[in-house]
């Protein structure tokens, strides 16, 4: 187990350099980069963490500031451009033995100057340098007096991030694309977005925007409307009939098969096609329904289908072939794909509804529908849904909310949602719940269905329920619902739609092929084992291994999206698939599947808290967050009305909202 030798991280000093009884401390920083190579030290926006006393802290500080100045400083303000240059030069002079002790005081003065920078990249970069000078002053003096020379024992790896980037599953360079919008360069903004997001019109509309929960502007007044700014860049290209500028590399002779044309499959194909690899996507749905769960799971009033199709057409134009109406395991086997292609990426999505577990659900009653995902798919494809006039949906996630809202648009006279916890504890996005409320959906909270009621013709007539009281928190942190004795009651209805979750259908994977499946019905992939200083395995926010390589135990077969980790958001599927595409490329070119140092650093930074909700952000002006125009009133949910509800920004509104961004970049560097 590694020991923290010194740390100033989080403004708390831990100093074990003199030996003796060590302070027991741990961080979410792994002790190795890849399970083998030790991380000896780490410098960043919140200080220094030292695992190895042999690390040359002055030399590391000098290299850190050199990289900040030459690689990351934007040069758009004088304090940043000049201040970082002088500071880097002073530190270099110290390491080269050309400085005096007075130069250590100059470092303090330069740090004060950098507090006037237009963004926080240069400001935050002074923190580890000042900590180094303060707590390792004797080491700096040893360089100044000529006693010490650079040992060059360690190699340094750097990476930049921002609180919003760190929280984005696709790691889009959010400050950069917002900066471009601020300068009315919408086309350049979209280029930046597409570096990590090939479905911008989709994620500009349906993304749950976790980035906004970590926006430092929120510490001043309210977060920047990051999602709608992304939509603004995409809408600008569409409304101006501009051609996307992507230019794939010359086509290579190795081919990739992709199972599923959902967000993960499309994203993987996009990034491989950019590198020149021919990709063939096999999609079970018919032509016209590319996009997977976006096409048959997300309502058109949230995501217009013509804009989804535009994103898909752009990907197809890069040489990606999508074969529709083809089910793997039925029309073509996975073994055949393995033989015909050099690599296979499994991204079938999660289209199988979970059972409710109530009495009568397996009897085939009229009006008891198979599941929420199935109901939505039939509705969007224009098929009979089997829905009546009084609809009950069971669940509390976004799919359940989509079902109650779509039921109204399909002609339901009453649409009711039953959820076993409180409104506050619903996993659905708050704005989607509010939208359902506005459209006239009826909610029954803290209610658990126990039995489906039917008449003599086996037609559903209602659901027997019991009231629930919220007890102690469970493993998810939410209070556990417990039945209230004697509280049984009936909700009258003619249709019941269970929408309590969905799973991938992996029945197309033969048992004898060598691909392992978890007890959660997801594909097992390899990962890099990372532990912190306390020996604890580091995992992501969903409890999965932090640094996943996305290759299965079957050589040349990879998995991503819902199939690899369970139901994910669109943006999480895309981030996952982008990583898979890079790993697949290395597999095709080198015969090895691994994560690069840059990718490992990306995972490490994601695991460390870049955003501090308690930070006091000094900012003089307070400007209200811009909200996009929206169609209001119950008439927007009238029968057959799938017109888009949220209308986006006009260009000037987007520019004004972009000006609220504080450009909160951070630079981190590890000694290996």
From Swiss-Prot:
Topology of this chain in the membrane: Peripheral membrane protein
Residues binding FAD: 254-283, 552-562
Cofactor: [4Fe-4S] cluster; FAD
BP term (GO), one: anaerobic respiration
Location of the protein in the cell: Cytoplasm; Cell membrane
Binding positions (NADP(+)): 388-421
SMART domains registered for this protein in UniProt: NADH_4Fe-4S
GO CC terms, sorted: cytoplasm; plasma membrane
Gene Ontology MF, one: oxidoreductase activity
Predominant location category: cytoplasm
Keyword presence, 4Fe-4S: yes
Oligomer status and interactors: Heterotetramer with 2 alpha subunits.
Its biological purpose: May catalyze the NADPH oxidation in the SfrAB NADPH-Fe(3+) oxidoreductase enzymatic complex. Probably involved in acetate metabolism and not in the reduction of Fe(3+) chelates. May serve as a major route for NADP regeneration.
Protein name: NADPH-Fe(3+) oxidoreductase subunit beta
């Amino acid at each position: 187990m590694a020991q923290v030798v010194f740390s100033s991280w989080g403004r708390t000093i831990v100093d074990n350099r003199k030996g003796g009884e060590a302070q027991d401390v741990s961080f979410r920083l792994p002790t190795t980069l890849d399970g083998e190579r030790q991380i000896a030290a780490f410098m960043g926006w919140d200080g220094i963490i030292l695992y190895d006393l042999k690390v040359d802290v002055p030399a590391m500080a000098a290299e850190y500031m050199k990289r900040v100045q030459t690689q990351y400083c934007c040069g758009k303000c004088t304090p940043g451009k000049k201040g970082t240059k002088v500071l880097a030069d002073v530190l270099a002079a110290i390491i080269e033995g050309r400085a005096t002790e007075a130069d250590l005081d100059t470092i303090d003065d330069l740090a004060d100057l950098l507090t006037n920078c237009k963004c926080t990249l240069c400001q935050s970069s002074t923190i580890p340098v000042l900590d180094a000078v303060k707590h390792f002053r004797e080491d700096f003096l040893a360089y100044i007096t000529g006693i010490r020379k650079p040992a060059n024992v360690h190699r340094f790896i750097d990476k930049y991030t921002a609180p919003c980037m760190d929280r984005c599953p696709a790691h889009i360079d959010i400050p950069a694309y917002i900066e471009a919008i601020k300068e009315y360069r919408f086309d350049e903004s979209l280029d930046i977005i597409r570096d990590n997001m090939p479905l911008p019109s989709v994620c500009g509309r349906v993304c749950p925007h976790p980035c906004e929960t970590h926006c430092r502007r929120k510490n001043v007044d309210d977060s920047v409307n990051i999602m709608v700014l992304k939509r603004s860049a995409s809408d600008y290209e569409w409304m101006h009939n501009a051609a996307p500028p992507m230019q794939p590399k010359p086509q290579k002779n190795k081919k990739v098969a992709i199972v599923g044309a959902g967000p993960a499959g499309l994203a993987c194909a996009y990034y491989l096609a950019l590198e020149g690899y021919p990709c063939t996507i096999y999609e079970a749905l018919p032509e016209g329904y590319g996009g997977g769960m976006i096409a048959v799971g997300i309502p058109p009033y949230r995501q217009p289908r013509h804009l989804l199709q535009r994103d898909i057409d752009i990907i197809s134009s890069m040489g990606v072939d999508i074969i529709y109406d083809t089910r793997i395991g039925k029309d073509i086997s996975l073994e055949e794909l393995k033989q015909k292609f050099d690599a296979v990426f499994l991204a079938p999505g999660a289209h199988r509804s979970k059972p409710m577990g109530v009495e009568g659900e397996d009897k085939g009653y009229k009006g008891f529908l198979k599941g929420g995902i199935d109901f939505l798919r039939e509705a969007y494809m224009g098929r009979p849904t089997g829905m009546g006039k009084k609809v009950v949906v069971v669940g509390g996630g976004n799919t359940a909310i989509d079902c109650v809202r779509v039921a109204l648009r399909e002609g339901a006279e009453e649409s009711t949602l039953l959820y076993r916890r409180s409104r506050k504890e619903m996993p659905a996005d708050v704005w989607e719940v509010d939208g359902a409320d506005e459209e006239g959906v009826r909610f029954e909270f803290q209610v658990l269905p126990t039995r489906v009621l039917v008449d003599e013709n086996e037609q559903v007539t209602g659901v027997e329920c019991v009231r629930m009281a919220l007890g102690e928190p469970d493993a998810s942190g939410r209070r556990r619902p417990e039945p209230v004795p004697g509280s049984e009651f009936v909700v009258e209805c003619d249709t019941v739609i269970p929408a309590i979750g969905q799973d991938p259908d992996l029945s197309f994977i033969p048992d004898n092929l060598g691909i392992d499946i978890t007890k959660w019905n997801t594909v097992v992939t390899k990962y890099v084992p990372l532990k912190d200083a306390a020996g604890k395995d580091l995992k992501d926010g969903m409890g999965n291994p932090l640094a996943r390589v996305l290759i299965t135990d079957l050589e040349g077969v990879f998995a991503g999206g819902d199939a690899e980790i369970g139901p994910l958001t669109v943006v999480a599927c895309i981030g996952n698939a982008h990583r898979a595409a890079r790993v697949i490329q290395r597999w095709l070119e080198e015969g090895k599947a691994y994560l690069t140092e840059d990718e490992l650093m990306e995972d490490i930074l994601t695991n460390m808290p870049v955003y501090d909700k308690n930070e006091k952000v000094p900012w003089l002006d307070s400007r209200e967050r811009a909200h996009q125009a929206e169609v209001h009133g119950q008439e927007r949910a009238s029968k057959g009305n799938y017109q888009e509800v949220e209308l986006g920004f006009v260009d000037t509104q987007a520019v004004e909202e972009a000006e609220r961004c504080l450009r909160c970049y951070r630079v981190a560097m590890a000694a290996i």
